Amino acid sequence: MKRLFIGIPIQSETALQLAIRWSNDGLLNLNRMAWTKARNWHITLFFLGATPGSEIAILEQLIGDSFHKVSQFTTRLNGVEVFPEKGKPKVLWLGVENLQPLVAAYEQLGDLLRANGFLSDAKPLVPHLTLARIKSIQNSTSLELLLNEYQSFNFGTVDISRITLFESTSTTAGVMYEPLFEKWLLKA
């Protein structure tokens, strides 16, 4: 069994520089956070979980069928937020402004994944880039200040060029996301 998800790889130099600064900031270090390595940055479209390796070819076909007419585009990373709520945060994330060019393909893929038994229910797409998983909060003031200061901060643009089937593997060096299949979007 492989732990799989479908997502969009993301690179942002502005977000990387701020994440490095925040992770080195004494105030934020009072809170226990596991920072996501920049090489693992992505927007999750669908989390599939434990999946037999024999199903990968089917997933490749479903992804290809769903996204074959979608063109590459640029979108913007805006604002810092937390899941599930500010009072009990578990995830620190950046918002993604607009994935509208691929929403129809996303919905089609969701329908195909459900029809083929990969997903049980439809979940709304909340496009975001996870910066850190919050283990515990010892200084809620520092986190609140960060959220207030960066709630509408423009982190710049990112190119959306491919949809990727990832395998998530836990190693002694941390979690690694290995691309198993990439569907490149059409050149704009």
Task: Label the model's feature ranges.
Residues 1-188:
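Histidine-dependent nucleotide/RNA phosphoesterase domain, centered on the 2H-phosphoesterase fold
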